[in-house]
Amino acid sequence: GIGAAILSAGKSIIKGLANGLAEHF
């Protein structure tokens, strides 16, 4: 469903942000 798609995208975005921050620190 749409909710699952949004959750999946959100998790991907959060993982991307976490990886980006890890590279800075």
From Swiss-Prot:
The modification Phenylalanine amide is found at residue 25. It comes from Bombina orientalis. It comes from the Eukaryota. It is found in: Secreted. Expressed by the skin glands. This is Bombinin-like peptide 4. Keywords: Amidation, Amphibian defense peptide, Antibiotic, Antimicrobial, Secreted. The keyword Secreted applies. Belongs to the bombinin family. Has antimicrobial activity, but no hemolytic activity. Preference on killing Gram-negative non-enteric bacteria. GO terms for biological process: defense response to bacterium. The lineage of its organism: Eukaryota, Metazoa, Chordata, Craniata, Vertebrata. GO terms for cellular component: extracellular region.
